[in-house]
Protein backbone atom coordinates (compact mmCIF):
# COMPACT_ATOMS: atom_id res chain seq x y z
CA UNK A 1 0.00 0.00 0.00
CA UNK A 2 1.25 3.51 -0.83
CA UNK A 3 2.40 5.29 2.34
CA UNK A 4 -0.04 8.14 1.70
CA UNK A 5 -2.94 5.68 1.43
CA UNK A 6 -1.82 3.93 4.62
CA UNK A 7 -1.72 7.21 6.52
CA UNK A 8 -5.24 7.96 5.27
CA UNK A 9 -6.49 4.49 6.15
CA UNK A 10 -5.13 4.90 9.67
CA UNK A 11 -6.92 8.24 10.07
CA UNK A 12 -3.67 10.18 10.26
CA UNK A 13 -4.31 12.83 7.61
CA UNK A 14 -6.51 15.78 8.52
CA UNK A 15 -5.42 18.32 5.87
CA UNK A 16 -2.85 18.55 3.10
CA UNK A 17 -1.83 21.38 0.80
CA UNK A 18 -1.91 19.67 -2.62
CA UNK A 19 -2.70 15.99 -2.23
CA UNK A 20 -1.98 15.03 -5.81
CA UNK A 21 1.41 16.77 -5.89
CA UNK A 22 2.34 15.39 -2.47
CA UNK A 23 1.38 11.84 -3.42
CA UNK A 24 3.47 12.15 -6.58
CA UNK A 25 6.48 13.44 -4.63
CA UNK A 26 6.28 10.52 -2.18
CA UNK A 27 6.12 8.10 -5.12
CA UNK A 28 9.03 9.53 -7.09
CA UNK A 29 11.78 9.29 -4.49
CA UNK A 30 12.98 10.09 -1.01
CA UNK A 31 11.25 13.13 0.52
CA UNK A 32 12.92 15.08 3.33
CA UNK A 33 10.34 16.26 5.86
CA UNK A 34 10.25 17.75 9.32
CA UNK A 35 8.12 17.96 12.43
CA UNK A 36 8.62 20.69 15.01
CA UNK A 37 8.43 20.25 18.78
CA UNK A 38 8.39 23.34 20.96
CA UNK A 39 9.76 22.76 24.46
CA UNK A 40 6.80 23.88 26.59
CA UNK A 41 7.63 21.34 29.34
CA UNK A 42 10.44 18.93 30.19
CA UNK A 43 8.66 16.07 28.44
CA UNK A 44 6.50 15.31 25.44
CA UNK A 45 3.09 13.75 26.08
CA UNK A 46 0.66 11.41 24.33
CA UNK A 47 -0.72 14.28 22.27
CA UNK A 48 2.67 14.57 20.54
CA UNK A 49 2.77 10.87 19.76
CA UNK A 50 0.45 11.13 16.74
CA UNK A 51 2.88 13.35 14.79
CA UNK A 52 5.94 11.45 16.08
CA UNK A 53 4.60 8.07 14.93
CA UNK A 54 3.46 9.53 11.61
CA UNK A 55 7.02 10.74 11.13
CA UNK A 56 8.30 7.26 11.98
CA UNK A 57 5.94 5.66 9.45
CA UNK A 58 7.29 7.91 6.71
CA UNK A 59 10.84 7.03 7.74
CA UNK A 60 10.03 3.31 7.53
CA UNK A 61 8.72 4.00 4.01
CA UNK A 62 12.16 5.34 3.03
CA UNK A 63 11.75 9.08 3.56
CA UNK A 64 14.10 11.24 5.65
CA UNK A 65 12.92 12.90 8.86
CA UNK A 66 14.21 16.06 10.47
CA UNK A 67 13.17 16.58 14.09
CA UNK A 68 13.16 20.28 14.88
CA UNK A 69 13.24 21.23 18.55
CA UNK A 70 12.25 24.85 19.04
CA UNK A 71 14.99 26.29 21.20
CA UNK A 72 14.04 29.72 19.80
CA UNK A 73 10.29 29.42 19.23
CA UNK A 74 9.97 27.86 22.68
CA UNK A 75 11.18 31.18 24.09
CA UNK A 76 8.33 32.99 22.29
CA UNK A 77 5.20 30.86 22.63
CA UNK A 78 2.72 29.68 20.03
CA UNK A 79 -0.65 31.48 20.22
CA UNK A 80 -2.48 28.85 18.14
CA UNK A 81 -5.93 28.33 19.66
CA UNK A 82 -4.70 29.29 23.14
CA UNK A 83 -7.03 31.41 25.23
CA UNK A 84 -4.27 33.50 26.76
CA UNK A 85 -0.63 34.47 26.42
CA UNK A 86 1.87 31.78 27.44
CA UNK A 87 4.24 32.57 30.30
CA UNK A 88 7.72 33.25 28.95
CA UNK A 89 10.41 30.85 30.14
CA UNK A 90 14.10 31.56 30.74
CA UNK A 91 16.62 30.36 28.17
CA UNK A 92 18.21 27.98 30.72
CA UNK A 93 14.81 26.39 31.37
CA UNK A 94 14.05 26.02 27.67
CA UNK A 95 17.53 24.62 26.98
CA UNK A 96 16.97 21.96 29.64
CA UNK A 97 13.62 21.05 28.11
CA UNK A 98 15.20 20.87 24.64
CA UNK A 99 17.71 18.26 25.85
CA UNK A 100 14.96 16.17 27.47
CA UNK A 101 12.82 16.22 24.33
CA UNK A 102 15.74 15.35 22.08
CA UNK A 103 16.37 12.26 24.21
CA UNK A 104 12.73 11.19 23.99
CA UNK A 105 12.57 11.57 20.21
CA UNK A 106 15.50 9.17 19.81
CA UNK A 107 13.24 6.39 21.12
CA UNK A 108 10.96 6.70 18.11
CA UNK A 109 13.05 7.85 15.16
CA UNK A 110 16.19 6.12 13.90
CA UNK A 111 19.04 8.64 14.12
CA UNK A 112 21.82 6.13 13.39
CA UNK A 113 21.14 3.83 10.44
CA UNK A 114 20.74 4.22 6.69
CA UNK A 115 20.81 7.10 4.27
CA UNK A 116 17.43 8.23 5.58
CA UNK A 117 18.54 8.36 9.22
CA UNK A 118 16.83 11.12 11.19
CA UNK A 119 18.53 14.45 11.85
CA UNK A 120 17.95 16.61 14.94
CA UNK A 121 17.97 20.39 14.49
CA UNK A 122 17.38 23.31 16.85
CA UNK A 123 15.98 26.55 15.45
CA UNK A 124 17.97 28.57 17.97
CA UNK A 125 20.93 27.80 15.70
CA UNK A 126 19.58 30.23 13.08
CA UNK A 127 17.39 32.55 15.12
CA UNK A 128 20.05 33.07 17.78
CA UNK A 129 22.33 34.88 15.35
CA UNK A 130 19.88 36.85 13.19
CA UNK A 131 19.50 40.57 13.93
CA UNK A 132 16.10 42.20 14.30
CA UNK A 133 16.77 44.39 11.25
CA UNK A 134 17.70 41.35 9.14
CA UNK A 135 14.61 39.55 10.41
CA UNK A 136 12.34 42.39 9.27
CA UNK A 137 14.13 42.96 5.95
CA UNK A 138 14.77 39.36 4.89
CA UNK A 139 11.71 37.60 6.30
CA UNK A 140 9.08 40.03 7.56
CA UNK A 141 8.67 41.81 4.23
CA UNK A 142 7.22 38.65 2.68
CA UNK A 143 4.25 38.62 5.09
CA UNK A 144 1.44 41.14 4.89
CA UNK A 145 -0.44 41.99 8.07
CA UNK A 146 -3.67 41.08 6.26
CA UNK A 147 -2.30 37.60 5.55
CA UNK A 148 -1.20 37.13 9.15
CA UNK A 149 -4.51 38.39 10.55
CA UNK A 150 -6.45 35.96 8.37
CA UNK A 151 -5.13 32.93 10.27
CA UNK A 152 -7.82 31.30 12.40
CA UNK A 153 -5.30 30.80 15.19
CA UNK A 154 -4.77 34.59 15.35
CA UNK A 155 -8.39 35.63 14.76
CA UNK A 156 -9.45 33.84 17.94
CA UNK A 157 -7.04 35.94 19.98
CA UNK A 158 -7.62 39.39 18.48
CA UNK A 159 -10.52 40.27 20.77
CA UNK A 160 -8.83 39.12 23.97
CA UNK A 161 -5.47 40.55 22.94
CA UNK A 162 -2.31 39.12 21.43
CA UNK A 163 1.21 40.46 21.87
CA UNK A 164 3.45 41.21 18.92
CA UNK A 165 5.72 38.46 20.28
CA UNK A 166 3.10 35.77 19.74
CA UNK A 167 1.73 37.46 16.61
CA UNK A 168 5.17 37.04 15.00
CA UNK A 169 5.33 33.35 15.90
CA UNK A 170 3.92 32.23 12.55
CA UNK A 171 6.72 34.08 10.73
CA UNK A 172 9.30 32.25 12.83
CA UNK A 173 7.75 28.87 12.07
CA UNK A 174 7.54 29.82 8.41
CA UNK A 175 11.23 30.69 8.43
CA UNK A 176 12.05 27.29 9.97
CA UNK A 177 10.59 25.63 6.88
CA UNK A 178 12.52 28.01 4.62
CA UNK A 179 15.88 27.33 6.33
CA UNK A 180 15.38 23.56 6.31
CA UNK A 181 14.45 23.70 2.64
CA UNK A 182 17.51 25.76 1.73
CA UNK A 183 19.95 23.76 3.87
CA UNK A 184 18.52 20.23 3.64
CA UNK A 185 16.01 20.27 0.76
CA UNK A 186 13.13 19.67 3.18
CA UNK A 187 9.87 19.94 1.21
CA UNK A 188 7.25 18.60 3.64
CA UNK A 189 6.17 19.62 7.13
CA UNK A 190 4.04 17.47 9.45
CA UNK A 191 2.19 18.81 12.49
CA UNK A 192 -1.06 18.95 14.42
CA UNK A 193 -4.18 20.37 12.81
CA UNK A 194 -3.99 23.40 15.12
CA UNK A 195 -0.71 24.27 13.36
CA UNK A 196 -2.19 24.69 9.87
CA UNK A 197 -1.87 28.49 9.88
CA UNK A 198 1.75 28.44 11.03
CA UNK A 199 2.68 25.64 8.64
CA UNK A 200 1.20 27.29 5.56
CA UNK A 201 3.14 30.44 6.51
CA UNK A 202 6.15 28.31 5.64
CA UNK A 203 4.83 27.26 2.24
CA UNK A 204 3.98 30.92 1.54
CA UNK A 205 7.51 32.07 2.42
CA UNK A 206 9.02 29.32 0.25
CA UNK A 207 6.83 30.36 -2.67
CA UNK A 208 7.46 34.09 -2.36
CA UNK A 209 11.13 34.15 -1.38
CA UNK A 210 12.50 31.11 -3.27
CA UNK A 211 9.80 30.29 -5.85
CA UNK A 212 9.58 26.75 -4.44
CA UNK A 213 6.68 24.50 -3.50
CA UNK A 214 6.40 23.15 0.02
CA UNK A 215 3.92 20.56 1.24
CA UNK A 216 2.04 20.26 4.52
CA UNK A 217 0.31 17.34 6.22
CA UNK A 218 -1.63 17.97 9.41
CA UNK A 219 -2.56 15.08 11.66
CA UNK A 220 -5.85 15.27 13.55
CA UNK A 221 -6.09 16.37 17.15
CA UNK A 222 -7.34 13.19 18.77
CA UNK A 223 -10.52 13.15 20.83
CA UNK A 224 -12.31 10.21 22.39
CA UNK A 225 -15.81 9.04 21.47
CA UNK A 226 -17.36 11.67 23.77
CA UNK A 227 -15.43 14.50 22.11
CA UNK A 228 -13.09 14.93 25.08
CA UNK A 229 -9.51 15.94 24.24
CA UNK A 230 -7.34 12.84 24.18
CA UNK A 231 -4.17 12.29 26.20
CA UNK A 232 -5.35 13.29 29.66
CA UNK A 233 -5.87 11.04 32.67
CA UNK A 234 -7.88 12.54 35.53
CA UNK A 235 -7.25 15.94 33.96
CA UNK A 236 -3.48 15.47 33.82
CA UNK A 237 -1.39 14.97 30.67
CA UNK A 238 -0.08 11.44 30.09
CA UNK A 239 3.64 12.13 29.73
CA UNK A 240 6.23 10.09 27.84
CA UNK A 241 8.71 10.60 30.70
CA UNK A 242 8.36 7.63 33.13
CA UNK A 243 9.19 9.91 36.07
CA UNK A 244 6.09 12.01 35.29
CA UNK A 245 3.75 9.21 34.16
CA UNK A 246 4.86 5.72 35.15
CA UNK A 247 4.62 2.82 32.67
CA UNK A 248 1.93 1.35 34.96
CA UNK A 249 -0.11 4.57 34.79
CA UNK A 250 0.26 4.64 31.02
CA UNK A 251 -0.79 0.98 30.85
CA UNK A 252 -3.91 1.76 32.88
CA UNK A 253 -4.69 4.73 30.64
CA UNK A 254 -4.83 2.49 27.56
CA UNK A 255 -6.71 -0.27 29.39
CA UNK A 256 -9.42 2.28 30.24
CA UNK A 257 -9.94 3.40 26.63
CA UNK A 258 -13.60 3.15 25.62
CA UNK A 259 -14.63 0.29 23.35
CA UNK A 260 -15.75 2.81 20.72
CA UNK A 261 -12.18 4.19 20.47
CA UNK A 262 -10.04 1.08 20.83
CA UNK A 263 -9.75 -0.04 17.18
CA UNK A 264 -9.28 3.52 15.92
CA UNK A 265 -6.47 4.03 18.42
CA UNK A 266 -4.80 0.77 17.36
CA UNK A 267 -4.54 2.23 13.85
CA UNK A 268 -3.14 5.53 15.08
CA UNK A 269 -0.80 4.52 17.90
CA UNK A 270 0.60 1.10 16.92
CA UNK A 271 2.66 -0.36 14.11
CA UNK A 272 0.46 -3.43 13.79
CA UNK A 273 -0.55 -3.95 10.18
CA UNK A 274 -4.06 -3.02 9.12
CA UNK A 275 -4.76 -6.71 8.49
CA UNK A 276 -3.69 -7.58 12.05
CA UNK A 277 -5.90 -4.82 13.42
CA UNK A 278 -8.83 -6.12 11.37
CA UNK A 279 -8.36 -9.57 12.93
CA UNK A 280 -8.29 -7.99 16.39
CA UNK A 281 -11.47 -6.05 15.56
CA UNK A 282 -13.35 -9.24 14.69
CA UNK A 283 -12.26 -10.98 17.90
CA UNK A 284 -12.97 -7.85 19.94
CA UNK A 285 -16.49 -7.41 18.59
CA UNK A 286 -17.25 -11.09 19.20
CA UNK A 287 -16.19 -10.83 22.86
CA UNK A 288 -15.84 -7.17 23.94
CA UNK A 289 -15.88 -8.13 27.64
CA UNK A 290 -12.44 -9.70 27.19
CA UNK A 291 -11.07 -6.26 26.22
CA UNK A 292 -8.65 -7.69 23.67
CA UNK A 293 -8.27 -4.39 21.81
CA UNK A 294 -7.39 -2.49 25.00
CA UNK A 295 -4.91 -5.19 26.07
CA UNK A 296 -3.14 -5.10 22.71
CA UNK A 297 -3.18 -1.29 22.70
CA UNK A 298 -1.65 -1.13 26.19
CA UNK A 299 0.99 -3.73 25.29
CA UNK A 300 2.00 -2.10 22.03
CA UNK A 301 2.16 1.52 23.19
CA UNK A 302 3.81 0.92 26.58
CA UNK A 303 6.41 -1.29 24.87
CA UNK A 304 6.94 1.34 22.19
CA UNK A 305 7.35 4.20 24.67
CA UNK A 306 9.09 2.49 27.59
CA UNK A 307 10.36 -0.89 26.36
CA UNK A 308 9.30 -4.52 26.82
CA UNK A 309 10.57 -4.85 30.41
CA UNK A 310 8.55 -1.82 31.53
CA UNK A 311 5.45 -3.30 29.86
CA UNK A 312 5.96 -6.66 31.61
CA UNK A 313 6.40 -4.88 34.94
CA UNK A 314 3.23 -2.82 34.38
CA UNK A 315 1.30 -5.98 33.48
CA UNK A 316 2.61 -7.80 36.57
CA UNK A 317 1.72 -4.88 38.86
CA UNK A 318 -1.79 -4.83 37.37
CA UNK A 319 -2.30 -8.57 37.86
CA UNK A 320 -0.90 -8.66 41.40
CA UNK A 321 -2.88 -5.63 42.59
CA UNK A 322 -6.05 -7.06 41.07
CA UNK A 323 -5.48 -10.33 42.93
CA UNK A 324 -4.49 -8.50 46.12
CA UNK A 325 -1.05 -10.14 46.15
CA UNK A 326 0.79 -7.17 47.63
CA UNK A 327 3.70 -9.25 48.92
CA UNK A 328 4.49 -10.48 45.41
CA UNK A 329 5.55 -6.95 44.44
CA UNK A 330 8.70 -5.06 45.33
CA UNK A 331 8.45 -1.67 47.04
CA UNK A 332 9.61 -0.10 43.75
CA UNK A 333 6.72 -1.78 41.93
CA UNK A 334 4.26 -0.84 44.68
CA UNK A 335 5.31 2.80 44.50
CA UNK A 336 4.65 2.74 40.77
CA UNK A 337 1.32 0.95 41.06
CA UNK A 338 0.06 2.99 44.00
CA UNK A 339 1.33 6.41 42.99
CA UNK A 340 -1.35 8.94 43.74
CA UNK A 341 -3.18 6.94 46.43
CA UNK A 342 -3.55 8.55 49.89
CA UNK A 343 -0.31 8.42 51.84
CA UNK A 344 0.25 8.73 55.59
CA UNK A 345 3.55 9.14 57.45
CA UNK A 346 3.46 7.07 60.65
CA UNK A 347 5.25 8.73 63.55
CA UNK A 348 7.82 6.76 65.54
CA UNK A 349 5.84 7.05 68.80
CA UNK A 350 2.43 6.43 67.23
CA UNK A 351 0.02 3.77 68.45
CA UNK A 352 0.19 1.02 65.82
CA UNK A 353 -3.03 -0.71 66.81
CA UNK A 354 -5.02 -1.31 63.61
CA UNK A 355 -8.11 0.55 64.85
CA UNK A 356 -6.09 3.55 66.03
CA UNK A 357 -4.08 3.69 62.78
CA UNK A 358 -7.17 3.52 60.58
CA UNK A 359 -8.45 6.67 62.28
CA UNK A 360 -5.18 8.61 62.67
CA UNK A 361 -4.26 8.00 59.02
CA UNK A 362 -7.64 9.26 57.83
CA UNK A 363 -8.64 5.96 56.23
CA UNK A 364 -11.87 6.06 58.27
CA UNK A 365 -13.50 8.86 60.24
CA UNK A 366 -14.17 7.19 63.56
CA UNK A 367 -13.13 4.32 65.81
CA UNK A 368 -16.65 2.91 65.53
CA UNK A 369 -16.29 2.74 61.73
CA UNK A 370 -12.79 1.28 62.09
CA UNK A 371 -14.00 -1.48 64.40
CA UNK A 372 -16.91 -2.29 62.07
CA UNK A 373 -14.61 -2.49 59.03
CA UNK A 374 -12.14 -4.78 60.81
CA UNK A 375 -14.85 -7.08 62.18
CA UNK A 376 -16.58 -7.23 58.78
CA UNK A 377 -13.36 -8.30 57.04
CA UNK A 378 -13.03 -5.11 54.98
CA UNK A 379 -9.45 -4.29 56.07
CA UNK A 380 -6.34 -5.84 54.54
CA UNK A 381 -2.71 -5.27 55.55
CA UNK A 382 -0.31 -6.07 52.72
CA UNK A 383 -3.00 -8.26 51.19
CA UNK A 384 -3.83 -10.18 54.39
CA UNK A 385 -7.31 -9.76 55.86
CA UNK A 386 -7.20 -8.47 59.43
CA UNK A 387 -10.23 -9.16 61.67
CA UNK A 388 -8.55 -8.90 65.07
CA UNK A 389 -9.39 -5.58 66.76
CA UNK A 390 -6.23 -5.91 68.87
CA UNK A 391 -3.91 -6.40 65.88
CA UNK A 392 -0.79 -4.22 66.14
CA UNK A 393 1.32 -3.49 63.08
CA UNK A 394 4.88 -4.71 63.61
CA UNK A 395 8.19 -4.49 61.74
CA UNK A 396 7.10 -7.57 59.79
CA UNK A 397 4.35 -5.43 58.21
CA UNK A 398 6.86 -2.86 56.96
CA UNK A 399 7.69 -3.99 53.44
CA UNK A 400 11.42 -3.50 52.90
CA UNK A 401 11.20 -1.38 56.06
CA UNK A 402 9.58 1.39 54.00
CA UNK A 403 5.84 1.05 53.74
CA UNK A 404 2.66 -0.83 54.55
CA UNK A 405 -0.24 -1.15 52.15
CA UNK A 406 -3.73 -0.94 53.62
CA UNK A 407 -6.74 -1.89 51.54
CA UNK A 408 -10.27 -1.04 52.55
CA UNK A 409 -12.90 -3.02 50.68
CA UNK A 410 -12.14 -4.20 47.16
CA UNK A 411 -10.36 -1.24 45.63
CA UNK A 412 -9.51 1.54 48.10
CA UNK A 413 -5.78 1.54 48.73
CA UNK A 414 -3.77 3.55 51.26
CA UNK A 415 -0.04 3.62 51.91
CA UNK A 416 1.59 4.01 55.31
CA UNK A 417 5.22 5.14 55.22
CA UNK A 418 7.79 5.13 58.03
From Swiss-Prot:
On whether ATP-binding is a keyword of this UniProt record, the answer is yes
Q: What Enzyme Commission number(s) appear in the record? A: 6.1.1.1
| Short motif 'KMSKS' region, span | 229-233
Residues making up the signal peptide according to the UniProt record: none
Q: Which GO terms describe its molecular function?
A: ATP binding; RNA binding; tyrosine-tRNA ligase activity
Tell me where on the tree of life, at the top rank, the source sits: Bacteria
Give the GO biological process terms.
tyrosyl-tRNA aminoacylation
Q: Where in the cell is it found?
A: Cytoplasm
Q: Where is the S4 RNA-binding domain?
A: 352-418
Where L-tyrosine binds, per the record, is at 34, 169, 173
Q: Tell me where the sequence motif 'HIGH' region sits in this chain.
A: 39-48
Protein keywords = Aminoacyl-tRNA synthetase, ATP-binding, Cytoplasm, Ligase, Nucleotide-binding, Protein biosynthesis, RNA-binding
Reaction equation(s) it catalyzes: tRNA(Tyr) + L-tyrosine + ATP = L-tyrosyl-tRNA(Tyr) + AMP + diphosphate + H(+)
Which SMART domains is this protein grouped with?
S4
Cellular component GO terms held in the UniProt record: cytosol
Main location, first listed in the record: cytoplasm
Annotated Pfam families:
SYY_C-terminal, tRNA-synt_1b
**InterPro entries hit by this protein:** aa-tRNA-synth_I_CS (IPR001412), aa-tRNA-synth_Ic (IPR002305), Rossmann-like_a/b/a_fold (IPR014729), S4_RNA-bd (IPR002942), S4_RNA-bd_sf (IPR036986), SYY-like_C (IPR054608), Tyr-tRNA-ligase (IPR002307), Tyr-tRNA-ligase_bac-type (IPR024088)
Where do the annotations place ATP binding?
232
**What's its job?**
Catalyzes the attachment of tyrosine to tRNA(Tyr) in a two-step reaction: tyrosine is first activated by ATP to form Tyr-AMP and then transferred to the acceptor end of tRNA(Tyr).
What quaternary structure, including any partners, is listed in this protein's UniProt entry?
A: Homodimer.
Give the family, as the similarity comment puts it: Belongs to the class-I aminoacyl-tRNA synthetase family. TyrS type 1 subfamily.
Under what name is this protein listed?
Tyrosine--tRNA ligase
In its UniProt entry, the species of origin is given as Streptococcus pneumoniae (strain CGSP14)
Classification from the root reads: Bacteria, Bacillati, Bacillota, Bacilli, Lactobacillales
Query: Which gene name does the record give?
Result: tyrS
Amino acid sequence: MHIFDELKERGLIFQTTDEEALRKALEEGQVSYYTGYDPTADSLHLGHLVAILTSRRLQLAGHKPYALVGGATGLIGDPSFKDAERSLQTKDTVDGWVKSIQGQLSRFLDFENGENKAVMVNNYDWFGSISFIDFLRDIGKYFTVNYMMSKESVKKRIETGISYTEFAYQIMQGYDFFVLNQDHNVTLQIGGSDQWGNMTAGTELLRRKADKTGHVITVPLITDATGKKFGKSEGNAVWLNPEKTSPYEMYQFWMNVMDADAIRFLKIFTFLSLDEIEDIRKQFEAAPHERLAQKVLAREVVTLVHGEEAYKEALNITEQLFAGNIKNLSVKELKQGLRGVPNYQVQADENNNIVELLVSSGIVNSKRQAREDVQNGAIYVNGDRIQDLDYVLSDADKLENELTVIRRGKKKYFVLTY
